[in-house]
Amino acid sequence: MNLNLIFKAQAIVLIINGLGSLFFGSLWIAQGTGWEATPDLIAFGQFTGVVLLVNGIWSWRFPDVAGENIKSIGMLFALGGLLFTAIILFHIVTGAIAGATPYINVVLTALFTLAFYFYSR
């Protein structure tokens, strides 16, 4: 395993989530959070889907573009992953989100965070 592979793996997860949020908004919201899929939440989910797609594209391309600076970008992704892990955990603990999806997301996000950190040192 190397840092380039971690970026590519995360890109795939982000792109899948982005496409799900963008094109299957009501399912993504209802299954992913346990909330009622209102038109407002679906619109927000579509916006979030585009953000996830863009982040997925960046994650896919960074190894090719960054060159020798890839470890610095990996550390930034580790920091971002730590923040995402913290907010997902906060939402789970406070009961703001429900279902299996948040647990899967927090585990995946934490694993990517650790991988980015350890392979970027």
Which role fits each region the language model picked out?
Residues I15-G20, D40-P63, L76-L83:
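Core segments of alpha-helical transmembrane spans in multipass integral membrane proteins
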Residues W58-K71, I92-V93:
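Juxtamembrane helix-break-helix junctions at the cytosolic face
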Residues I73-I88, V107-F112:
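Hydrophobic alpha-helical membrane segments
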Residues L3-I6, N17-I42:
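Membrane-helix boundary elements
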Residues A110-R121:
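Membrane-water interface at the C-terminal end of transmembrane alpha helices
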Residues M1-A11, Y119-S120:
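N-terminal membrane topogenic signal
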Residues T33-I42, S72, A96-V107:
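Non-cytosolic membrane-interface motifs at loop->transmembrane helix junctions
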Residues D64, A86-Y103, Y119-R121:
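Membrane-helix boundary connector in multi-pass membrane proteins
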